[in-house]
Amino acid sequence: MIGFARIFFIGVFVAGLGGLSLAAAYRVGGTPGAVSAERIVSVADPAESDDSPPPKAKPEPPAPTRQQKLDDLFARLAASTDPAETDGLIAAIDRLNLESGSDTGDFLMARAVAALGSQNLQVSRALLDKLIILQPGWAEAWNKRATVRYLMDDERGSMADIARVLILEPRHFGALSGMGMILERGGFSDDALRAYRRALEIAPQLASLRAAVDRLTAAVKGQSL
């Protein structure tokens, strides 16, 4: 009786610590006398209890920045072998290029683009002048003004704006294409070909760039004969 009472006391004591009942002690060891102190403590260890808190969920990764999105799109554009995919990537790049990160900047850009679309070049130019003062680091503001200045027959001013675009975003194939157009128009075929080729490296499936490179390559070869 003394031995049984002692085992019963141990079972109750362990149950108070970790939920181990006398019946569990019997199941673990087969008989009360077969349950070692180490085994009882191991079963009752709070570290191994089902009551331990669940592991903390991993935090969500931060959303990609605008620059990271552009880097990804340009990498995919350079690797693309499908003209249809190229068109989609270019459209996505154009949308990101039109995002300034500022409501005011986006508003002015939208008005400038609308004025450009309706051939109201003076209004578009004035809006872009203001936008460049507000956000001089926005490559697309300079690019749009380069377009407006070209349409206003200000090729020197357009080239100056294109140079600024390419400092801010060297992968701007639209600016490189515009540079090629101006150089070709001025009779600088070699320089124009270099600009077109650089643009084609960035967007190798863009048909208009391929046509320009092929045309000028033939022209330059003809001049050297």
Predicted region positions:
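TPR-repeat structural position
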Residues: P83-T86, L121, E155, S189
